[in-house]
Amino acid sequence: DFLWNNLGAGQDNRLEDVASSKSQAKLISFFARANYTLKDRYMLTATIRRDGSSRFGTNHKWGTFPSVSAAWRISEEAFMEDLQSWVANLKLRAGYGVTGNQSGIGEYKSAMLMGTGGGAYFDSESNSWKQSYGVTQNPNPDLKWESTAQTNVGVDMFLFNRLNLTFDWYLKKTSDLLYTYQVPNPPYLYSNILANVGDLTNKGVELTLGANLINHKDFTWDANLTLAHNKQTIDKLSNQVYQTDRILSGSLQGILGMSNRYSQVIEEGYPVGTFYGPHCEGIVDGKFVLANDGEDEILGNAQPKLTMGLSFNFTYKDFDLGISGYGMYGQKVLNVAGMERGYTAHMPNYNITSSFAESGISDENMPVYSDFWLENGSFFRLQSVTLGYTLPARLLKNFGVNRLRFYATGENLFVLTGYTGIDPEVSTSDLKEVGLDKGNIYPMPRTFSIGLNLSF
């Protein structure tokens, strides 16, 4: 396999590069579930998973992940009979479960890999050049599953035949976080290794309200509201083997003069996405004045304090109207694009933001990273508005058509925000760059469409 799947291992260093590769991974899973219901009031569910992955070390390829949940439908109890006229449903829920994660891990990160040594030697016996070979990464036979244990308690209610309410509290503890740690060389062959070390806690509440506000013959009005709050804390980054005080993240690579500058820190006691840098006290004579001689400090966080969703649905005779939107509150966004495009020294060869050209900022050290560029990223986006009209059935019966509805939809109609960049809704998929607006995103389009729904 080493020969046939690694053609580059046999190349002569004096010739053009030749390369090939082959990789495979295997996942084996066993799953069992048991459900029990008594009198349609008491419900119990238990599951267990046993997963094995070839990605992990020889000592920890398998992981066991149990879960259990229970519910009590209180509204079915005899003592609730007098209240059923206004409490149609009342259910308490509780659960605990463990899940495993192997995403983001290469197929052979735990193994000792062999490869070319980056050089060649001349073999006098065969009168030819030959490749050198060696170990290409630090093996870790103890690499194992990253696991998350979640506890949740919730309640479901349906009141007055009009109001739906769901409330959940949760606590999620993630253990054995996977991260590439710096290690001494020697005794290790290389200066980094992928290992399980960190612990992370998320806890929060979620509330969902649904209401039938008006229910008349010709006019109805339904409303739905969701609210969520999450608090995240990094509990541990080090153990007895792998040590680190903090992890710098939020790279500003690519910004003029900032190739080695980071805007965030991952540190115990703080959430992911914590901005870290100097505090700007103001601008004097066109120069930034930084507190404490420009010493870095905690500046805020990219994670929202509150997320929300809101929707309304109306009907009036044969017309219908749907409106939906969502928003976030309390998060910070680093306007990296503004930092770069506000560099007045680029003039007149490059186009910069006009507001900075007129601001009087002339600091020759620009761009300077500080909380001057850190903005409130709170926003509310009107996601969608749809207006429809359904033709009366009496007009369709002679054409063999059951239903014909015309509609017009507008999406991303406006955003309410104080953010000065392109869009406050920056990506959070890359945890190393949460809340960074580098201006390299494709703007969310505003779209309009018309159409019809036809059924026979």
Regions found by a protein language model. Give the residues of each.
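Flexible glycine-rich, low-complexity coil/linker segments exposed to the extracellular/periplasmic environment
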Residues: 1-21, 118-138, 250-299, 348-373
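Extracellular/periplasmic, surface-exposed regions of secreted and cell-surface proteins
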Residues: 1-256, 309, 317, 327, ...
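Short edge-strand/loop segments of extracellular domains
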Residues: 89-91, 228, 329-333, 339-344
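Long amphipathic alpha-helical scaffold regions
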Residues: 66-74, 342-353
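Compositionally biased, intrinsically disordered/low-complexity regions enriched for serine, proline
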Residues: 268, 301, 345, 421, ...
